[in-house]
Amino acid sequence: MMKRQLHRMRQLAHTGSSGRTPETAEFLGEDLLQVEQRLEPAKRAAHNVHKRLQACLQGQSGADMDKRVKKLPLMALSTTMAESFKELDPDSSMGKALEMTCAIQNQLARILAEFEMTLERDVLQPLSRLSEEELPAILKHKKSLQKLVSDWNTLKSRLSQAAKNSGSNQGLGGASGSHTHTTTANKVEMLKEEEEELKKKVEQCKDEYLADLYHFSTKEDSYANYFIHLLEIQADYHRKSLTSLDTALAELRDNHSQADHSPLTTAAPFSRVYGVSLRTHLQDLGRDIALPIEACVLLLLSEGMQEEGLFRLAAGASVLKRLKQTMASDPHSLEEFCSDPHAVAGALKSYLRELPEPLMTSDLYDDWMRAASLKEPGARLEALHDVCSRLPQENFNNLRYLMKFLALLAEEQDVNKMTPSNIAIVLGPNLLWPPEKEGDQAQLDAASVSSIQVVGVVEALIQNADTLFPGDINFNVSGIFPGLAPQEKVSSQQVSEELPPVTVPAPATTPAPTPAPASMAVRERTEADLPKPTSPKVSRNPTETAASAEDMTRKTKRPAPARPTMPPPQPSSTRSSPPAPSLPPGSVSPGTPQALPRRLVGTSLRAPTMPPPLPPVPPQPARRQSRRLPASPVISNMPAQVDQGVATEDRGGPEAVGGHPPPPALPPQPRPRGLISETE
């Protein structure tokens, strides 16, 4: 038993890496040996491909069409779209697009189900039979043949050994020798019979194995067709899917373009406005002036010319992004941004900065720098004119348009604080920049110096816009923004001519007929210089005059008290207020204030707003006399001579109502606080 196992191990060791075995190699030719070596790799390849391809299936394996479609993710997506479509307006653009997409996903799901069923039938099942049935059967026959050959070789070894033993026993004499010889001969006969039977089995198994090898070699091409058919099925699946998608996309785009009533929505997408070259943008839209330049200029001409710090102050990022999107999708809705000129200016700067090539062109960068380096103004202006003439036509038109606008903006520098120098500092780096070159720090320093020269170039263009770009310009070139820039704001000369001269009205020489009391110092002086009109309702006594003066100083309007029916007593009374020391007529200095009596009636004097320099009169006598003054109704028809007589007695001078007013340098004496409160 141990010898048999050891012999088997030797056979396995002699097999080698090529897969050849001594048991089968002696029965096979060179061609069949190569076929035999391809059996194991073919079996492993078919098994692995079948396993991974089975994992690629999205539907239920082995199910019919309807069950398979329900399990597909595309069908689940189509169902979700159908449920979402019910909540949308079927006439809206989004509703129509979602409905069409839902139908396409359903169609793609059915195409995928058909593809998977075909794949299972024509590829997966043959690979499964090849890896699980056909090749294992051939390998099983090979293994059986190896075992039979091994057993046959072992039996032949035993038979040879038995024959040797039988020959050695034949030379022994005696009864025991003949018995041993007979036993050995019988054993040899039995081994010969077994060897004959085993040889027949080996021949039979060898024939079957050779037949399998021939069959495999003839069907090897058909096995390769499995993989070719896999690619054909996939190509057919993708072709059907692409056809369905192309048909649906064409129909969907037609419907969407018909539903869109704005021609610029599809003609000017965001990618065709910002970040593209100027020539491409103008050719695609059929324009002479870039859309962002014209729209932003018209918006600023409409509202933002006097905005302080225009182009210098940054706008909000969200507002700027929304403005740029509106610019690209619906330029007719830009009027809502008129109230934010900084956002409009930011959109213009963003467009100039995002151009692939600067508006003043990189090819002429050195020429611009040479023109800026000239010191003599005339030579510099001539050099700038020469460089402008060599610009491409589309660049020249847009630069002329922009410089004309910036010149108008600089005319408002007293209000917006944007001088040509400030405008050039802000916009210069967006109009011209040096070509991109990789270099050291010295080149970076040179670039920073060139940016200063760029500012000088742009400043000179703004200051000499009328010389370098002669003639007026119509800023509303395309005519699609009639509401942004009125026709009177189109050219620079029209803007300046529209400002009417400001006329200052001359002051009135005659007073208003209204007899209402004045509350301002200027009006008081005017009324003091004019004759005092007779009030149709009331005539004030001296006490009321002083009270009204106090009211004017407090900025408070109070009702006047009733006028007494009896004339005031003579100033010589012991209870009257002591008069101020009188001077002879004509001896009063005009610069010296004079105290006036309290009960001056009929005069046109008004109390000043500032207190007089003289001290107040003791209030006691006046308070006792004021209690004796009875209140009476207003008498509008009292003769003016009464007031005139009282004034004459108190004052000692001929002061009448219609007479000339006293000198303004003689203010009346202020009224005591106690008398004012009692009178009120």
From Swiss-Prot:
GTPase activating protein (GAP) which specifically converts GTP-bound Rho-type GTPases including RAC1 and CDC42 in their inactive GDP-bound form. By specifically inactivating RAC1 at the leading edge of migrating cells, it regulates the spatiotemporal organization of cell protrusions which is important for proper cell migration. Also negatively regulates CDC42 in the process of actin remodeling and the formation of epithelial cell junctions. Through its GAP activity toward RAC1 and/or CDC42 plays a specific role in phagocytosis of large particles. The record marks 312 as: Arginine finger. The modification Phosphothreonine is found at residue 592. It is found in: Cell projection; Cell junction, Tight junction; Cell junction, Adherens junction; Cell projection, Phagocytic cup. A motif (SH3-binding) lies at residues 607-616. The keyword Cytoplasm applies. Interacts with RAC1. Interacts with the exocyst via EXOC4 and EXOC8; required for the localization of both SH3BP1 and the exocyst to the leading edge of migrating cells. Interacts with CD2AP and CGNL1; probably part of a complex at cell junctions. Interacts with CAPZA1; recruits CAPZA1 to forming cell junctions. May interact with AFDN. Interacts with PLXND1; they dissociate upon SEMA3E binding to PLXND1 allowing SH3BP1 to transduce downstream signal through RAC1 inactivation. Interacts with ABL1, GRB2 and SRC (via SH3 domain). GO terms for molecular function: GTPase activator activity; semaphorin receptor binding; SH3 domain binding. Residues 1-24, 160-184, 488-680 are annotated as: Disordered. The modification Phosphoserine is found at residues 241, 262, 535, 582, 632. PANTHER family: 3BP-1 RELATED RHOGAP, BARGIN-RELATED. The BAR domain mediates interaction with the exocyst components EXOC4 and EXOC8 and is required for the function in cell migration. It also mediates the interaction with PLXND1. This is SH3 domain-binding protein 1. The lineage of its organism: Eukaryota, Metazoa, Chordata, Craniata, Vertebrata. Residues 160-169, 536-546 have a biased composition (Polar residues). Residues 81-262 form the BAR domain. PROSITE patterns: BAR (PS51021), RHOGAP (PS50238). Residues 1-11 have a biased composition (Basic residues). Keywords: Cell junction, Cell projection, Cytoplasm, GTPase activation, Nucleus, Phagocytosis, Phosphoprotein, SH3-binding, Tight junction. InterPro entries: AH/BAR_dom_sf, BAR_dom, RHG17/44/SH3BP1-like, Rho_GTPase_activation_prot, RhoGAP_dom. Residues 470-680 are annotated as: Interaction with CD2AP. Residues 276-469 form the Rho-GAP domain. GO terms for cellular component: adherens junction; bicellular tight junction; cell leading edge; cytosol; exocyst; lamellipodium; nucleus; phagocytic cup. SUPFAM superfamilies: BAR/IMD domain-like, GTPase activation domain, GAP. GO terms for biological process: actin filament organization; cell junction assembly; cell migration; establishment of epithelial cell apical/basal polarity; negative regulation of small GTPase mediated signal transduction; phagocytosis, engulfment; positive regulation of GTPase activity; regulation of actin filament depolymerization. It comes from the Eukaryota. Residues 502-516, 561-571, 609-621, 660-671 have a biased composition (Pro residues).
